Curated annotation (Swiss-Prot):
The gene is rnhB. This is Ribonuclease HII. Belongs to the RNase HII family. It comes from Streptococcus pyogenes serotype M2 (strain MGAS10270). It catalyses: Endonucleolytic cleavage to 5'-phosphomonoester. Coiled coil: none annotated.
Length: 263
C-alpha cells in the first residue's frame, strides 16, 4: 500500500536539504498531489537558502568587527526625518554575535503585515535595546539633522545600566560625537543586520506613537501616513489647521503658521 499524500507532506516538512534522498525517491511517484508537494517543498528550501545567504551577507560588517576583537556591536538607525508631524525616533540595538532573524531587513523593505512579528523577534533576541525620541518642538529648535543626532545619542544613553554595553557602533549614514568607536554606513539598514534591527525597532515604536496621535488628533490620517504629507494629511491641515505635534519649521506647516493664528 502506497504512503498517503498527507503522510508524505508531513515527511517533506522535516526535509531541509535539496540533496535529501526523499526527493529522488518521490520523483518516481506519479500522483499529482505528491509531485505538487515535492515542488512546493523544494521551492521553500530554495527560498530558505536564499534568505540564509542574504542574512549572511548582511552580517559582513559585524563579522569583520568580531575578528578585530569587538564583542558588543550596536546598530543605530532612525525613523521620521521627513514627516510634517510627530517625533524623530532612533533605536540602538545590540544583537548576539552571528544572530540571524529571518525576514529582518531595512524596515522600508519589510511588508507592514510583518513589522510586528519581526519587531518582537528582535526584542526577544537582542542583548540590549535603547530608544531615543526627539519631539517636534526640539526638531523646530535645532533642525531635523541635529535632532536626528540627538535621538541617536539618547538611544545609546538608554543602554546605560543594561548588562551589555556597546564597544562599537554601526550607524546608518551618520557620525556621532561620542567616545565609542564607530562606522557610518550608507544605506546601513539594508547592509547591516544590526542597523536593520534598529530600523524596525524605531519604525514600530514611531508607528505606535503616530497611531496614538491619530486617536488624539483625528482627521489627519496619522495612523496610516505616520505624519508624512499625504493627500489626506494635507486635506486635514486645510480643514482643521495645525496640531501641537506638527513641525512648524516644515512646509507647508511653516507657511500656515505665518498666515494664521494657529499655535
Amino acid at each position: 500500500m502506497s504512503t498517503s499524500i498527507k503522510a508524505i507532506k508531513e515527511s517533506l516538512e522535516a526535509v531541509t536539504s535539496l540533496l535529501d534522498p526523499l526527493f529522488q525517491e518521490l520523483a518516481t511517484d506519479a500522483r499529482l498531489g505528491v509531485q505538487k508537494a515535492l515542488k512546493s517543498r523544494q521551492k521553500a528550501i530554495q527560498a530558505d537558502l536564499a534568505e540564509e545567504e542574504r542574512l549572511e551577507a548582511m552580517l559582513s560588517y559585524e563579522k569583520a568587527l568580531y575578528k578585530e576583537g569587538y564583542q558588543a556591536i550596536a546598530g543605530i538607525d532612525e525613523v521620521g526625518r521627513g514627516p510634517l508631524a510627530g517625533p524623530v525616533v532612533a533605536a540602538c540595538v545590540i544583537l548576539p554575535q552571528h544572530c540571524k532573524i529571518k525576514g529582518l531587513n531595512d524596515s522600508k523593505k519589510i511588508p507592514k503585515s510583518k513589522h510586528e512579528t519581526i519587531y518582537q523577534a528582535v526584542k526577544e533576541k537582542a542583548l540590549a535595546i535603547g530608544i531615543g525620541i526627539i519631539d517636534n518642538q526640539l526638531i523646530d529648535e535645532v533642525n531635523i539633522y541635529e535632532a536626528t543626532k540627538l535621538a541617536m545619542l539618547e538611544a545609546i544613553k538608554q543602554l546605560e545600566g543594561q548588562l551589555t554595553q556597546p564597544d562599537y557602533l554601526l550607524i546608518d549614514a551618520m557620525t556621532l560625537d561620542i567616545a565609542i568607536s564607530q562606522q557610518s554606513i550608507l544605506k546601513g539598514d539594508a547592509n547591516s543586520l544590526s542597523i536593520a534591527a534598529a530600523s524596525i525597532v524605531a519604525k514600530v515604536t514611531r508607528d505606535q506613537m503616530m497611531a496614538n496621535y491619530d486617536r488624539i488628533f483625528p482627521g489627519y490620517g496619522f495612523a496610516k501616513n505616520a505624519g508624512y504629507g499625504t493627500k489626506e494629511h494635507l486635506q486635514g491641515l486645510k480643514a482643521y489647521g495645525i496640531t501641537p505635534i506638527h513641525r512648524k519649521s516644515f512646509e507647508p506647516v511653516k507657511s500656515m503658521c505665518c498666515n494664521s493664528t494657529n499655535p
